Design a protein with these regions (language model features):
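Cell-wall glycan-active module
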Residues: 16-219, 224, 291-455
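Alpha-helical segment that forms one wall of the substrate-binding/catalytic cleft
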Residues: 98-108, 230-311
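Extracellular structured ligand-interaction cores
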Residues: 131-136, 226-227, 231-236, 275-280, ...
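A positional/structural detector of protein chain ends, strongest at the extreme C-terminus
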Residues: 1-4, 453-455
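Short secondary-structure capping micro-motifs at structural edges
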Residues: 222-225, 265-267
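Cleavable N-terminal signal peptides of Sec/SRP-targeted secreted and luminal proteins
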Residues: 2-21
Length: 455
């Protein structure tokens, strides 16, 4: 039976390959249906390659090893991402390496480990592998080499084996040579992102966003790329816009890492103590931003999709709604390989990585969010803390209360979010109250219409 036919059966009947289907050849990574990196054509390389000496990834907090490290090895990482870092491969001198991935995962001990997962649809082993498959699938779409030429040069399965090994290729949005950067330094070194053109600023402004996460207006004497406050996409699953850089900065502070990403956003690509390029991506993958659950929690079934979605099969541990969180993509999977970008690429990559790990993809119709009746932003629940309008007119201290619309001070509804985030609610309520007094005008409050400000 040919490898191509086996692959067809796996996908057509939603089957998974047993983990022991891989045969180690001793020198290389896994060989078999999903091949290995050494059998792939070399990727295009950009830049001069990694330096001979550098600052390697380290963790100032010395976090203990994650359970992920017990099963996802350096050999597996380097087999899956041989073309990382603009084609040069994993390197501890550059943003993407197993060491950087390992350190980042230690800050998220639930990632790829099945900790605090209660679904009975999949085994603990299947859950942890599906978690990694989803994260890597989104990285393929966001920063993969995505070399369509492989499908004209190789048989279909062999082409897929190399295509989906192209993750963590790009550093910057629009890479490998980004139009957001100076044409003379277009993104072939991590430091190239220290300044940008006006198109790369990605500065979102409103009264509340500017209060919490103001953009830097600093410039340098470089007419081709004069701006320092550049919040375009960086990292494996690219975070973008000042409010995401700012929220990531807030989280870093909560784990004893002080860094000013609003002033120096390119530290996401250059900081190595700890390395932030993969950590920023894991933070985005693991963290809910109401009304959006964390992608991880959707994969693990730790979310509440609502009655209408549940009746349509969109509940529990599924993949499809995760595509809503990054780019609101619900166009489904293309029939041919490699297909186009967007949700189709995410789905195909998710299938490939699950095949590699020997884990199931889940019901076919839930791989896309296209038939999901109620999208994430329309599921009714409390989402943020806002001034308590029921008491703001009273001559008593101002308070905040959960509101059914979004904001930058999150409320984690206990019916929709995991307990670890619900535990943040009391602190977030106090934060909201502080901002009411610090800047009441952004809530359209003053001492005349809101007597509580006098107390």
């Amino acid at each position: 039976m040919s490898a191509q036919f086996v692959a067809f059966l796996l996908i057509a009947f939603n089957l998974s390959l047993p983990a022991n289907a891989f045969i180690s050849d001793g020198a290389n990574a896994s060989v078999g249906l999903f091949g290995n990196a050494s059998s792939c054509p070399k990727a295009a390389k950009f830049g001069k390659g990694p330096p001979k000496s550098c600052t390697i990834p380290s963790d100032p907090n010395n976090k203990p090893a994650s359970q992920l490290e017990s099963w996802f090895t350096r050999e597996m990482f380097e087999d899956l991402f041989p073309f990382a870092n603009l084609g040069w491969g994993p390197s501890s001198c550059w943003p993407y390496s197993y060491d950087a991935f390992k350190i980042a995962s230690r800050y998220f001990p639930e990632f790829g480990t099945s900790l605090n997962v209660n679904n009975t649809v999949y085994t603990a082993d299947e859950n942890k592998k599906r978690d990694l498959a989803a994260f890597f699938a989104h990285a393929i779409q966001e920063t993969g080499e995505n070399n369509n030429y492989l499908y004209t040069a190789l048989p279909d399965q062999e082409a897929s084996n190399c295509f989906y090994r192209g993750g963590f290729y790009n550093w910057f949005e629009g890479g490998p040579s980004s139009n957001f950067l100076n044409p003379e330094t277009p993104g072939h070194s991590p430091t190239d992102g220290n300044s940008c053109t006006s198109a790369g600023r990605y500065c979102s402004a409103s009264d509340q966003i500017t209060f919490f996460y103001p953009c830097s207006n600093s410039t340098i004497s470089n007419p081709a790329a004069p701006y320092k406050g550049c919040y375009f996409g960086r990292g494996g699953i690219q975070i973008s816009y000042n409010y995401n850089y700012g929220q990531f900065q807030d989280w870093l502070k909560s784990v004893n890492i002080t860094v000013d990403l609003l002033k120096e956003p390119n530290l996401v690509m250059t900081k190595m103590d700890p390395p932030l390029a993969i950590m920023a991506s894991l933070w985005f993958y693991m963290t809910p931003q109401p009304p959006k659950p964390a992608m991880h929690d959707i994969l693990m079934g730790n979310w509440n999709s609502g009655a209408q979605n549940s009746a349509a099969g969109y509940d529990g541990p599924i993949f499809g709604p995760t595509s809503l969180i990054i780019n609101n993509e619900c166009s489904g999977e293309d029939s041919k390989n490699p297909g186009g970008p967007g949700e189709s690429r995410r789905i195909k990559a998710f299938k490939w990585f699950n095949g590699y790990f020997g884990s199931p993809v889940g019901p076919e119709h839930t791989l896309s969010c296209g038939k999901m009746p109620v999208k994430l932003n329309a599921i009714p629940h409390y989402q943020s803390y806002q001034p308590d309008w029921s008491s703001s007119w009273k001559p008593e201290r101002c308070d905040c209360a959960p509101a059914s619309y979004g904001g930058l001070v999150y409320y984690f509804d206990p019916n929709y979010y995991p307990a670890s985030f619900v535990a943040q609610n009391d602190l977030n309520r106090k934060k909201c109250i502080e901002t009411v007094y610090a800047n009441p005008s952004m809530y359209f409050m003053d001492k005349k219409n809101s007597l509580c400000l006098n107390y």
